[in-house]
Amino acid sequence: MTNMEKEILLLISRVRCVTEAQFRKIYGDQKRYNKKNFKKTLRKMCSEYTLKKYPCDVDYYNYKDLSYVYYLNGSKLFKGDDLIKALVGSELVVRINTAGCDVKRFYRNVSVDDMKYDLFIEYTDQFGNIKQILVDVDLDNEIDISKYENLSRKIDKSTIPFFKVPNVLVVTPDNLSELNDLDRYDNEYSINFIDLGLNKLFNCI
């Protein structure tokens, strides 16, 4: 197995699915992997049934990806809103890692005090600081701010190893200017809203 294959398997085992466009963000600018080798490696892994490849064709508000989506052979196949949430989660991991950070934990559909969150991400930033964020991908414009209140109490009722109250990131196609007028801060945590294109991500996390 080549180094590139090992890296691809490690990435996709963490995020469960990733698009060809997301792969290019990781490997496209690395001189040790040219485009031809990258495409050849993906094709080889699909022909050997290590990966499965499906058309993506997602065009939803600010999130667009018309390339292909790759799954580990045997992994769950996402469709509809679940696919959008899965790919937005993968995009978050890709952007965090390509910015020089290192994702340590990545969980989908996590429970905190009987409330469901779409994602939990723990990563170290460029300076070695550990950061934790809870992420909700809101596609229905039904944001309930009360869900994020009293997090210091709620995180005690979770199997996730929180070491402090995490920040909250809500990914939404809604009107960000209106959302940013909400009372987003209390004494312990912050809620940040970001569009589906994840523009200005690092201003939020």
Outline where the language-model segments fall.
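A short, well-structured beta->alpha microelement
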Residues: 107-123, 145-157, 193, 197-200
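Active-site metal-binding core of divalent-cation-utilizing nuclease and nuclease-like domains
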Residues: 95-141
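Hydrophobic, Leu/Ile/Phe/Ala-enriched alpha-helical segments that form helix-helix packing faces
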Residues: 27, 42-46, 92-100, 152-159, ...
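Domain-level recognition of nuclease-like catalytic cores that cleave nucleotide substrates
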Residues: 174-205
